[in-house]
């Protein structure tokens, strides 16, 4: 029987732990984690995401502020702002909402963020730490949230399982593969140039799709009893749908995340978690004592 992995419910539980951690920092250390989100331009989807992040942060007791800049903001001006936030010791976490306008190089912006305040975990130092060790303190939000969902369904021991990641982006695909490799899974990372993707996915115990194509994954991609994590968020006829054709694969899988209420809430929860971790790092506090129950699954 197919079971839904309810990311909304699981994320709510994580956020309860984070709220407790924030209260702990305030009471015992006199600290309030602070997050600054920068958005450039008026991309409607980005505005929705930023509002969701700020609302969630505020609900957990985090000091959150969105800095909205006009779309003609120059790259130099944006880097200057990031540097000012880097230098401000009262700011613990910095996020620059992507995508940026075409005239701004996102790589330069990401590299300008202090790696200890990089809650997206996109900075090359944090990417390198993730590649080197399972014990990297900061992990990218969507892949880390997806891994948490996988473990919630299958248990903490994923050793020996075959996993296929569809999509090789720096944001989801590559770090997702790295996290699963640290769990001793055997990884196949597929992409737009991969031949016969279905042949790869049909061998997998775990399939993670982050390709951004509505209903790309059909039942002929999936072996019976597989676990499917749908990272895709696509608009079709005004409705939010995933990369996975949910109804088509539903009777074939053992576990699956819905869209919405799957990976999306986990991404925001792990952004909040990273904000608490960066606060602990900058203040030389033992983060595991503050948020140990969440960290155990990572």
From Swiss-Prot:
Any GO molecular function: methenyltetrahydrofolate cyclohydrolase activity
Amino-acid positions noted as binding NADP(+) in the UniProt annotation, renumbered to this chain: 167-169, 192
A Pfam family recorded for this sequence: THF_DHG_CYH
InterPro entries according to UniProt: Aminoacid_DH-like_N_sf, NAD(P)-bd_dom_sf, THF_DH/CycHdrlase, THF_DH/CycHdrlase_cat_dom, THF_DH/CycHdrlase_CS, THF_DH/CycHdrlase_NAD-bd_dom
Taxonomic superkingdom: Bacteria
Pathway: One-carbon metabolism; tetrahydrofolate interconversion
PROSITE patterns membership: THF_DHG_CYH_1
Xref: CDD domains: NAD_bind_m-THF_DH_Cyclohyd (cd01080)
Coiled coil feature spans: none
GO process annotations (BP): L-histidine biosynthetic process; methionine biosynthetic process; purine nucleotide biosynthetic process; tetrahydrofolate interconversion
Keywords: Amino-acid biosynthesis, Histidine biosynthesis, Hydrolase, Methionine biosynthesis, Multifunctional enzyme, NADP, One-carbon metabolism, Oxidoreductase, Purine biosynthesis
Reactions the enzyme catalyzes: (6R)-5,10-methylene-5,6,7,8-tetrahydrofolate + NADP(+) = (6R)-5,10-methenyltetrahydrofolate + NADPH; (6R)-5,10-methenyltetrahydrofolate + H2O = (6R)-10-formyltetrahydrofolate + H(+)
Assigned EC number: 1.5.1.5, 3.5.4.9
Cellular component GO terms held in the UniProt record: cytosol
Gene3D superfamilies: Leucine Dehydrogenase, chain A, domain 1, NAD(P)-binding Rossmann-like Domain
Cited function: Catalyzes the oxidation of 5,10-methylenetetrahydrofolate to 5,10-methenyltetrahydrofolate and then the hydrolysis of 5,10-methenyltetrahydrofolate to 10-formyltetrahydrofolate.
Record-stated family: Belongs to the tetrahydrofolate dehydrogenase/cyclohydrolase family.
Assembly: Homodimer.
Name of the featured protein: Bifunctional protein FolD
Source organism of the structure: Neorickettsia sennetsu (strain ATCC VR-367 / Miyayama) (Ehrlichia sennetsu)
Lineage of producing organism: Bacteria, Pseudomonadati, Pseudomonadota, Alphaproteobacteria, Rickettsiales
GN (gene name): folD
């Amino acid at each position: 029987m197919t079971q839904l992995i309810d990311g909304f419910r699981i994320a709510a539980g994580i956020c309860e732990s984070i709220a407790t951690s924030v209260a702990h920092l305030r009471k015992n250390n006199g600290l309030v984690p602070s997050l600054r989100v920068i958005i450039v331009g008026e991309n409607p989807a980005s505005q929705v995401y930023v509002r969701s992040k700020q609302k969630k942060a505020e609900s957990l007791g985090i000091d959150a502020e969105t800095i909205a800049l006009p779309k003609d903001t120059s790259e130099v001006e944006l880097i200057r702002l990031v540097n000012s936030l880097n230098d401000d010791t009262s700011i613990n976490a910095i996020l620059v909402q992507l995508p940026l306008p075409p005239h701004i190089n996102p790589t330069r912006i990401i590299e300008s963020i202090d790696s200890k305040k990089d809650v997206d975990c996109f900075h090359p130092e944090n990417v390198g730490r993730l590649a080197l060790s399972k014990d990297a303190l900061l992990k990218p939000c969507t892949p880390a949230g997806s891994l948490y969902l996988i473990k919630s369904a299958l248990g903490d021991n994923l050793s020996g399982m075959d996993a296929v990641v569809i999509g090789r982006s720096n944001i989801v695909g590559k770090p997702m593969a790295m996290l699963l490799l640290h769990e001793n899974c055997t990884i196949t990372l597929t992409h737009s140039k991969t031949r016969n993707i279905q042949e790869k996915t049909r061998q997998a115990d775990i399939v993670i799709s982050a390709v951004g194509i509505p209903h790309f994954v059909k039942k002929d991609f999936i072996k019976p009893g597989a676990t499917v994590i749908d990272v895709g968020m696509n608009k079709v006829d005004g409705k939010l749908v995933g990369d996975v054709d949910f109804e088509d694969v539903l009777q074939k899988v053992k576990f699956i995340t819905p869209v919405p209420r799957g990976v999306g809430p986990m991404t925001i929860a792990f952004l909040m978690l990273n904000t608490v971790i960066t606060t602990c790092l900058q203040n030389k506090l033992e983060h595991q004592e503050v948020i140990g129950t969440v960290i155990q699954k990572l």
